[in-house]
Amino acid sequence: MAQRRASLGKITQPNVSAVLPRKRLFALLDAQRAAAWVTGPPGCGKTTLAASWLDHAGLRSLWYQLDEGDADVATFFYYLSVAAAARDDGAGEPLPLLTPEYQAGLAVFTRRYFERLFAQLKPPFAMVFDGYHEVPASSQLQEVLRIALEALSPGGRMLIVSRGDPPASLARLRAHQALTLLGWEELRLTREEAGSIVAKRQLGLGAEAVDALYARTQGWAAGLVLMLAQARVSGAIAEAPGLPTRQLIFDYFAGEIFHKADVRAQQFLLHTAYLPEMTTRIARELSGDPGTDELLASLTRNNYFVSLRETQPEPVYQYHPMLRDFLQARAGEALPKERRRDLQRLSAAQMEQAGRIEDAVALYRDCHDWDDMARLIEVHAAALVGQGRGETLARWVEELPAEVRTSRPWTLYWAAASQAQLTPRESRLLYEKAFELFRSAGDRVGTVLAASGAMFAILYELDDCSLLDRWIAVLDEAEKSGVPLPSPAVQARVACSMFISLTLRQPQRRDMKQWIERALVAAQSQADINLRMFVGSLAALTVMWTGLYARAAQLLEALRAMSTGPGVTPFSLITLKNIETMYAMFIADGAACARAMREGLEIAQATGVHTWTFQLLVWGYGGALGAGDLGAAAAIAKQLEPLTGQAGRFNLCIYRHFQAWDALLRKDLMEALQKEKAALRMAVEVGCPLYEALCRLGLAGILADCGDERRCISHLGTLRNIARGIDNRHLEFTCLTGFAQIALAHGRLRTGLAALRRALELGREYGYFHFLGWQPAAVARVLAHALEAGIEPDYAKSLIKRRNLVPEKPPLAVEGWPWAYRVQTLGGFRLLHHDEPLAAGGAKAKRRPLELLKLLIAYGGEQVSESRVTDALWPRIDGDSAHRSFTSTLHRLRKMLGEDRAVTLHEGRLSLDRRFFWLDTWAFEQLAADLESAAEPVQIEKLVERVLAVYRGSFMADEADATWMMQARERLRGRFARILARVYRHWQERGEEERARELYEKCLEIEPLAPPPGQFKPTVIDR
């Protein structure tokens, strides 16, 4: 409340009811376009014109007096929001504060801010920014006001009042006549206006005297008023002195008037000279004059360079800057140094009491009262940080002498807090200094807060996580000794800094869950919804990285519910979207991942909050890779590349790791090797064990594929040492699956299956279906091994179905592989969909689609031309009609199957997709090829058993003998006979006649038309 009360003078229009209305200038302003720049020398009536024009126009208005404090644009937006709130009817949401997360997108923030402000003001309205010359040219406010002018809505007017001309940044607006200029030539008094002012003073001056006054002042309002005041006290009009500047002329005449004023008035003016603004109470306290009310009213009424602003709960007065400069210079001449310092100190105390903190700090600084200045900074630092005014806070601390700064730990602490997000490295160093001072002073609470602050600074930078070790130890010690923290909000933040630090740096710690729950419980009691969302988001992130996805889902649901409440900032919303994107990536929900990423980026684009833009894109990239959508992944990578320069090593580590994953999916081993090496180097440099483990696993797999077994084993050994102590089931699942892939691919069956067994047990227990670096073909291969070995078959099948897995070489011979469609044609036709008959019922309607399916199988199931199909199925109709029949039948087949992708048509050729179909003909052909190349007796025996299990009889034995069917039947029968003849001969050559005869008898049971044993000769086999 003090801050709002303190701001009222700054945002209140001066009362100018007693001044001369300048109708000539009103007409100019009325005729001008939406924005006008009012410029002229001091004392020419700029502020008075702006205020009186507002009264004349009768518009809903907002007044803002700029000063040097507005160089920090966060201060500007803070007070502008206070001004808007004072005029709002309560229907609109409060305007946002420029907190650090907006700084990177200041232009977007500014545009959206003013769009909302203009909507709240409801056209027609007017805004006045007075005192633009007070703002340094280097301030970002220059750009802010340019954007505000460009965003000015129809029906809105804006006046900017300054002693100088518009800056170069506004040149385009001037060129397009969107900003007009009222300068000295327009502002100088006309002879008629000067005469009206003289007449109001009732000095009885004639026309010649007025002419003389006008000639001497050249239309300068301040000069005219001063000369009239001097004439009143001296009885004659003085000559204008030949001084080079208007300020010196002002000082000359003001000195004449001051010298002739009574002692009481002189004392009052000198005692109040240091006040930037005052109420009658404040002026009375400083001057000790009981007639303060009358004095100030008289100065205002006579326009003696004192303005009145009708603020609540009481009005405030301001000296014109020229008068204030004069009075302070006169005080320097008339008062002893110590008296001046006392007045400054007393003025500062009054400003502090009134809530004018900026003015109080400036006054304490000017009188070198460093202790009170530092005390005031420490008292109000938390509020300033919350308002986003870290630049102001840092500047104040910097203005303190070094010996004061380095002796006050809380001053250093707040200086660190003011810079944590924007310059985290400098912030960390300040926290370290504050920590040492707190420790020397025995301030245990201070040491905990400094340690927690240093942690957050390190986390904002994400460049060297090893720095966290020191502060983790500090918080551990504080926990053991029971350091009492001042509030639940502080408890939540401290616990939060601890568990996220443990996640990144010491994931082996078993107490991480306790720290998470402590933070969540402490945050729940807080009214600050953004604090609750901050803690909840980091908690969700941590449990996600530890593989507890069910718990992460619960936390995300709670966060989504909170996010719809009032007061939630864009930063909180984008943080939530970042966590949602990450979660969807982890659980391989590609659509949800892309949606959350897109929504987060849209909020960032709309608000200018780009804190998480890189991570949103990185998680979206990982989600696209996990979904196997390489096109979407490439598009996201293209967006990421321009951002890598500012990403930081941790984020770059993630990106390079994902680029290696991308390269593997594209089968570019060399690029994968290069990217994964870079990722591992950064993971080690950053000091994040979790990512070092993932990068070493990825690199080991790539090296194995490259044939570098020695380095592969070395990385696996280091990985084992890292992962062994980490209590993370998902990391264990990932590493064991990756190790199994490597081992099984290189013939280490026993160790590979042992690792696979443990991995699948974990996957089943915790419901895992994905990991970073997922390669569908490689995972499919190890799951084929699992099914062959009987390892967790139900879970393996569910994983295959959920992720649509098929190895590069389809596992046609693997029993239990959960094919979407199984088609038996050897010995009779049977179509199963997920092991249930599909073609039962509606046989007539399905006859033609099934015939098409049988034909495709007869022709090998792949790359069957449309013409070949139409020639076989519709031989008696013309081309167009045949094509229509083909198209219709294909549509009906896909509809019957319930999966359009199962039957593909590309460039006029039909294929059954091997990801969906198991055909006994395909399985037979593969087994036959394996058997023809087999040499070991045990291998031959196993393959024969499989062949006999698959080849159950002639192709489509129960179907009509169409030409295309008979051709396929004979081809397959011949292949069957040839491979069995080879095996028959193999057993004969080994002297195992009985086994050879048993084989022949089985062959006759299956295929009665097989040739007799006597014809199983090498020549026949060869032929």
Briefly describe each language-model feature range:
Residues 1-23, 788-846, 850, 900-911, ...:
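Short boundary/linker motifs that mark transitions into or out of structured domains
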Residues 1-42, 48, 52:
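Walker A/P-loop-proximal flanking segment of P-loop NTPase domains
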Residues 3-5, 24-25, 48-50, 126, ...:
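Alpha-helical sensor/transducer elements of the RecA-like P-loop NTPase core
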Residues 37, 42, 50-54, 143-147, ...:
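C-terminal boundary/linker of central alpha/beta nucleotide-binding cores
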Residues 44, 49-125, 134-136:
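Conserved phosphate-binding/catalytic loops and adjacent sensor/switch elements of nucleotide-binding enzymes
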Residues 154, 312-314, 324-344, 370-371, ...:
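Intrinsically disordered, charged and Pro/Gly-enriched terminal/linker segments
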Residues 301, 361, 381-382, 398-402, ...:
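Amphipathic alpha-helical segments of tetratricopeptide repeats
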Residues 375-382, 410-424, 448-464, 490-508, ...:
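Tandem amphipathic alpha-helical repeat scaffolds
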